[in-house]
Amino acid sequence: DNHGNRVEGKYDNNVRMMLTGQVFAIMSGTADEKQVQAVCESADTYLYDKDAGGYRLNTNFHENKFDLGRMFGFAYGEKENGAVFSHMTVMYANALYQRGFIREGYKALQTLADTALDFDTSRIYPGIPEYFNAEGRGMYAYLTGAASWYMLTLITEVFGVKGSFGDLVLEPKLVKEQFDDDGNAGIRLEFAGNTFVIR
């Protein structure tokens, strides 16, 4: 916090965990494979809430901690205080795919998509909102970089279409659920001035 005190961990039988620090440890390669697995298990235990739309940004700290940015200016489940923040969830998925945790990355992406497409829950036009609140309602449809990160992750990690020194490289990481009934999955995109349909 602003006073140099540890923020995450166990406090009075309450676990405090934030997704942001975990994402950057995974994405940067700082966390080794065993640590990434431990992060996944902890995130599933303490941050994942399917009804709210996926991975919450943090657990409930059960206090108003005003020396930690603006997050505690909001009730738990809103904005930076415990909402399912789409951008960070997609970055979590991207980091997991990069590190080979495909099933875990898929879960993060798919839960966001399922919630956004469930109008009775999200109450928002299909798309990725800035965040889902405690009830799973999508908030602020156009105030997020999550959509571009979602597309980046689908193209470069899920379908595995990347450029490398001018060459087109394919390294798909699709899971069974992403294929249709005929066993097909495909993507159409532009690369080096050409249009490709990859199936």
Task: Identify the meaning behind each predicted range.
Residues 1-199:
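Acidic, mature catalytic/reactive cores of soluble proteins
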